[in-house]
Amino acid sequence: MELPYTEPLTVREAGPRIVPEPPRRGEPGGEPCGLCSGGATKAVWGNEHFTLHPPVGGSMPGHVWLASREHVDSFCDLSPEAAQAFGPLVARIERAILAEGDVGRVHVSRWGDGGAHFHVWFMPRPLGMLEAKNFMLPLWEDVLPNVSDEELREAAERIAARL
């Protein structure tokens, strides 16, 4: 794995800690939740617990995100029914992304720092793109040239059709 930058890079010091942290979207005092207010990209698939969405802007067709229908923050906040449905659904989404072809691995990530509505990201690592292994994939996804939002949505719709 390699950074998508050339030398020389310098390590900078971390800034001061900000406590309490500022509110995120969907938290009291923060901006409205994008999902609950209808500001998120239109879902390509959904069931009683989750919806699947394409990203806006991105370089890797097949990159999708899964959100809970209920406004909760984390895995531990999901209803028992949604938590039970989550694992099998993740496996189905991974298989659907792998079926796109030319995919080495599917990375599943949850950061949660931007918004307080539970969502996870599925990122396909292109087959043979070994410099993007592990935690490097999001960095490479960010610096590679974007494809059109239409191409991202079409890939997401193909993935949804396999679910």
Could you describe each region identified by the protein language model?
Residues 1-66:
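Active-site microenvironments that recognize anionic phosphate/pyrophosphate groups
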Residues 1-19, 126-163:
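C-terminal helix-cap and adjacent tail motif
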Residues 48-50, 104, 116:
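Short beta-strand or tight-loop elements
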Residues 55-57, 69-71, 111:
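Histidine- and/or cysteine-centered catalytic micro-motif in compact active-site loops
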Residues 64-87, 140-148:
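Short histidine-centered catalytic/ligand-binding loop motif
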Residues 79-104:
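A long amphipathic alpha-helix within ATP-dependent nucleotide-binding catalytic cores
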Residues 101-114:
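A short glycine-rich, hydrophobically flanked beta-strand micro-motif that places a catalytic Asp/Glu
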Residues 118-125:
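A short beta-strand motif that forms the metal-chelation/ATP-contact edge
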